[in-house]
Each structure stands twice: as C-alpha cells, then as structure tokens.
C-alpha cells in the first residue's frame, strides 16, 4: 500500500479510536505551536505528529515519559535543529497528560 494512503487510514483509525481526546490533543498542540507554524486556525498541520504520539501513547506511564515521547515525535519529524529544546514541550505535555488521564477514566 502507498505510504500516503496508509497514513491517511491510520489517521482516520486514530481519530475514531480516540474521538474527543484526539481533538483535545490537536487543540493543545496547535495552541502551544512548538514549531511556530504560521496559522490562525487549526487546520491539522500537526496531525502527523499527533498520529505518531497517539499510536504510542500507551507507552507513557507518567507525565515524564509522555513529555519524552512528545519531544521524540517532534525531534523525529522536524529534526534536532528545528524542534527546539525539550523544555519547549513541557506545558503541552502536561495538558495532554491531564486530558489522557480523563480519557482513560471514561
């Protein structure tokens, strides 16, 4: 299967599986905008990173491991020179962790 088609299918699966939690993570990442993408509206520019994060989020045992996972996803997708330092992702990771705890409690 073509990688782009596979990525779109995976995106739809994750959106369906996580529902409102997916939207919450998307809003959090868009609001914190760690790569300083130029956008006034959340048009899904960070969707590949959100997909990568959510496909592995069950590995996160606590806030620290989620923070490391989030940083790793952005470092992989944008490169060491573009992603900034780990601290840049701390506030977003904290908000995502709180949303994840609410999601797991449902």
Regions found by a protein language model. Name each.
Residues 1-106:
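Charged, amphipathic alpha-helical regulatory modules used
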